[in-house]
């Protein structure tokens, strides 16, 4: 006998959290029916898109078998009598009217966060077999937030001239292109021959270089080792127009990441680093130079790769001073190969964790994206928390303009053919933060950040972004 699952909601926008819930519903049932609240449904003004457009958005999903309009939820459930009613995990500790109805006929109310291991957005794009332009992909996002191509171009131009102070871990990225030779006859080892080596400034250094490339006056504060990689990085930063206040730490080498690549694929990455905390004396030097320069900047960016630059006391002193000067402050704490913690940066204006980093921060691998966003917000007291989802784009959950409700939305990934995904988060962080510092609302800022990420992943290695590059991607 066919098992029916029912999911209901507003669905002003179908984001990654919904897609994962739909997929889970199909895994536990034979048929998925989605109920969309009618325009007349009393939701205190939270319905922002006409029911016809919302139906079209949900119906196009590959996991949805049927869509119904809900004028009265209780009547709809009594008429349909679904075997399972599925809701997001964030509803599990709330009062749910469905519980009173479903017991009447013996159904089940279940909660799920959706599995983040698979890229549902990428899967949908593959099913559709099409590749939309950037403008085609963001048309709905533009409409929902009253944006336009001209307004986004205006934001991109307005970030020029900002004064940006970046603090964080300096990294040198090496790319060694190799020619595959074959498999060793002695053991199952891939044998390659090096052909060409390229070196780029990475880590927080490229965040500062991106800021300079986008037209800002960029200052970078960090540490490096007393070695050739450190000297090469400092010289590169100077050539890229970054004012570098980088202190020598004789207790560590300059952090270096070497990627061995063949035929456009990375075979192996070797990290050379020390991640112990820098000593108190050096930490005080960094803190003091930042505090001395705060008043002459518009934006502070904390770029934490967990290699020892930041102490909790340093973060507290700088953020407290930033608030006194009414500065925009943004932070990212990466957990790709290291173990970062974005909750180390409370009370800033913007944080940009990946989904993995957000889940690690609140120790929750089960809740949906809305639930995770709420938990991170409560842990950090930060309102603007775009969560980056890789090939699924960016998800943002924040208070609406009246502060009475919440708005969820998603910008899809804007580059389907990435060359090198490393550095995408850095590009997103700096472009989003600079947009906010220029006065843009968070929706415009996240769109600009997404365009910047699309530009970055389209090339190998870290090269600074430019405003012309962002505008060209927006037109593509």
Task: Label the predicted regions.
Residues 1, 138-181, 474:
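Positively charged, low-complexity intrinsically disordered leader regions
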Residues 1-144:
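Nucleotidyltransferase catalytic core that binds NTPs
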Residues 6-18, 167, 192-201, 308-309:
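Short, glycine-rich nucleotide/cofactor-binding loops
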Residues 10-11, 90, 169-170, 305, ...:
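Active-site metal-binding loops of divalent metal-dependent hydrolases
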Residues 15-31, 200-214, 319:
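Histidine-anchored nucleotide/phosphate-binding helix
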Residues 31-38, 88-89, 219-224, 329-333, ...:
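Short internal beta-strands
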Residues 172-301, 463-476:
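Conserved N-terminal subdomain of the carbohydrate kinase-like
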Residues 277, 296, 313-328, 335-347, ...:
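Conserved phosphate-binding/catalytic region of the ribokinase-like
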């Amino acid at each position: 006998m066919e098992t029916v699952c029912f999911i209901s909601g507003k669905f002003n926008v179908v984001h990654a959290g919904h897609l994962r819930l739909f997929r889970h519903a199909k895994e536990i049932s034979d048929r998925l029916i989605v109920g969309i609240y009618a325009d007349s449904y009393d939701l205190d003004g939270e319905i922002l898109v006409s029911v016809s457009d919302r139906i079209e958005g949900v119906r196009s999903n590959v996991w949805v078998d049927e869509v119904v309009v809900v004028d009265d939820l209780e009547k709809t459930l009594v008429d349909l009598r679904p075997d399972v009613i599925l809701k997001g995990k964030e509803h599990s500790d709330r009062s749910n009217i469905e519980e009173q109805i479903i017991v009447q006929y013996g159904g089940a109310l279940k909660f799920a966060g959706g599995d983040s291991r698979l890229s549902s957005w990428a899967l949908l794009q593959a099913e559709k077999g099409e590749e939309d332009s950037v403008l085609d992909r963001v048309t709905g996002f533009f409409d929902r937030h009253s944006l336009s191509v001209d307004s986004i171009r205006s934001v991109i131009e307005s970030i020029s001239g900002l004064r940006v102070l970046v603090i964080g871990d300096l990294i040198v990225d090496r790319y060694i292109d190799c020619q595959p030779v074959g498999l060793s006859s002695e053991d199952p080892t891939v044998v390659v021959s090096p052909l060409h080596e390229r070196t780029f400034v990475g880590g927080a250094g490229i965040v500062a270089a991106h800021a300079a490339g986008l037209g800002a006056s960029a200052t970078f504060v960090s540490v490096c080792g007393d070695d050739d990689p450190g000297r090469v990085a400092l010289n590169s930063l100077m050539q890229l127009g970054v004012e570098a206040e980088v202190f020598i730490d004789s207790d560590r080498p300059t952090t270096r990441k070497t990627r061995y690549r063949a035929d456009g694929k990375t075979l192996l990455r070797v990290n050379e680093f020390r991640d112990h905390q820098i000593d108190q004396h050096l930490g005080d030097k960094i803190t003091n130079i930042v505090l001395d320069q705060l008043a002459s900047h518009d934006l502070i960016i904390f770029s934490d790769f967990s290699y020892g630059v930041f102490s909790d006391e340093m973060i507290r002193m700088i953020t407290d001073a930033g608030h006194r000067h009414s500065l925009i402050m943004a932070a990212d704490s990466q957990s790709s190969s290291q173990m970062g913690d974005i909750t180390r940066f409370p009370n800033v204006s913007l944080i940009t964790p990946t989904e993995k980093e957000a889940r690690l921060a609140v120790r929750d691998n089960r809740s949906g994206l809305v639930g995770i966003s709420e938990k991170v917000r409560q842990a950090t007291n930060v309102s603007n928390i775009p969560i980056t989802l890789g090939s699924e784009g960016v998800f943002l959950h924040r208070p609406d303009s009246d502060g009475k409700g919440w708005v969820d939305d998603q910008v899809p990934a804007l580059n389907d053919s990435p060359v090198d995904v490393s550095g995408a988060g850095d590009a997103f962080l700096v472009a989003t933060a600079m947009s906010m510092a220029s006065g843009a609302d968070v929706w415009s800022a996240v769109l600009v950040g997404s365009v910047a990420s699309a530009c970055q992943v389209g090339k190998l290695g870290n090269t600074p972004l430019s405003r012309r590059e962002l505008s060209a991607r927006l037109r593509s």
